[in-house]
Amino acid sequence: MRNYLLLRDRLTQVWLNKYSITVTILTAKIVLFNYFIIRILRYTEKYAISSCNGLDQVNRKVYDDLPIFVNTLGNYMIRKSMLESVEASLRGLEILIDASEGLLGFLVDLYLGTYACLLISAVDGAVDVATNTTEHILEAVNNTLIEATRGLDDGLNDLTSLINKGGNRLSSIFKSDNSVAASLSKVNFTVKGLRNIHLSSKINDQLQYMADKVPSFDDLKSETKDLISIPFYHVKREITKVNAESLLPDTKILYLRNNTDTTLYPICGQYIPNIKKVYEHLIHILKVGNILVAILGIFIALFMAIPSIQKEYQESKRLNNVQDEVSQYIDNKEFMSSGDNSSLNYSPFNDSKFNLAESYQRNFNPIARWMTIKMGKYFGNDETEYSERLQFCMLYIFSSRSSTIMAMGLIGLITVAIQLIVIQIISNYLSNTGKVHIQLQASNDEINKMIKSDINLWTSLANQYVNGTEANLNTQVFGWITNTTASVNATVAHAVDKIEYILASSFNNTPLYKPMKTVVGCAILRKLISVENAMTWINNEAHIKLPRINTTELINIAGHTKMLPSSNESHMFDQVEKIVNIARKTALNELYVPLALIGIWLTQIPMALLLSWRRCDTTGKT
């Protein structure tokens, strides 16, 4: 029995060769990687379905409860803001009415008090001057007339005596003529009347009466203020009795969506079968890929056993070749002498002319030998030293250890390449699954459209509510302002008429009427007319305009703030894409290992060159 393995013994272990084991490890790596992706996809599928169901619940709450809550809150805020606006308007009106009443009273005091006082003082002074002047004139005239009468009386007395004397004589002549006697008597009577003539003091009395009758306007001022205060009093009393709630329209006009209107949910649930289909298709691809990789790996591993069998035969043949070379060398030795027993102890391993290692490398490293022959032909250098150095470099680079590093690096590159191919297949499939995305996006657009429709309806009814509040406020509250200004205008008109009546009754047909009317018109009437114009302007402008809700701005705000949650479909595909990206990054990170191994193997090239040049002789052992 031999103490070493024969060829048939080694053939029983050919399936344990390094190539089959490497292929098996490579296959297991790819299969495990695919199963890792499958498990992640399973988890993501469960997460997506769970999130989809959760999204349906959220959308149901959002679409059912949130709009109702927002409607209720918005309606409450609108009603509250309208109520506060009405109450603030009422309080402001009270202040405005008090201020207006005080201002008008001040104007009455100013125009009918100050100016009238000055005017009356001026008139009183003028009448007093006229009365005093008249008294002096009357006194001077009367004194002059009295003195003249006295002088005339003395002269006439003498004339009368003379005439009477002559008359006695003439009477005897004209006894039958009574006209002469009458004329004489008349002359005496005329003188008598002249004696009694003087200017009457009634003129002075009339002037004094006129001075006492100059109007003081006190009654007019009091009457005007009383008339002005009447509408203000009634307005303030009505405002204090106003209930702000009564000015607001019925809240039933405001829109409140019924939760039974919902017809779109489940939004995402109806697409769960499509989501499952996407994941199942991906998982099916990976499972089929695993089966194919496993089958292919088994066949490759079995196929790798064939080269191992061939290698065993070749190694056996190479071993025989080495043995033949040794035998041939021994046969060629010239030591065949019958008397010499040294041939019995001869060993080629001790012969310096026979290099057993070179024979082994030449027969057991065919790759290095083949590379040496090809490179020698390529560079066209057949020198022995160059050929030996090249052969040494090839043997060093493709030694068993270096070849193992190189093989591991290449296998790693192949593994990473297969993983990247699988990842790219999944990525391509995801890029072709936009149909579900379009369907879900269409559903999302439909929901947004319905939300916008609800917003339009709500804002329309809310604006109707604001319109009703504004109309009630302008009619029931600011209508009093209209009535008040109309009453003030009527009072002012009455005051103007009364002033004109007083002037007419006091100064008509007198020299003072025209200047008095001019002065009063300038000092008082123009001011009252200005007040009347101001009241007319207030009457035309006294109304409130409440702001309306802008539908476009509200929809834009809702769009900018992402008020409606987006569909879960994009989130689902984002998760799958993240997994694919993570797997791609993992594969790319694994690429560093085979590249590092290839880099280590490449470092053997400069080391081989360095060692080949440092060899002292080309025939030495390596």
Curated annotation (Swiss-Prot):
Instruction: Give a GO biological-process term.
Output: plasma membrane fusion involved in cytogamy
Q: Which domain of life is it from?
A: Eukaryota
**Name of this chain's protein:** Plasma membrane fusion protein PRM1
The protein's location, in the record's own words, is: Cell membrane
Q: What are the transmembrane regions?
A: 21-41, 103-123, 289-309, 405-425, 591-611
Work out whether the entry's keyword set contains Cytoplasm: no
Q: Which family does it belong to?
A: Belongs to the PRM1 family.
- Note the topology in the membrane: Multi-pass membrane protein
- Protein purpose: Involved in cell fusion during mating by stabilizing the plasma membrane fusion event.
Q: Which residues lie on this side of the membrane: Extracellular?
A: 1-20, 124-288, 426-590
Chain ranges sitting on the Cytoplasmic side read 42-102, 310-404, 612-622
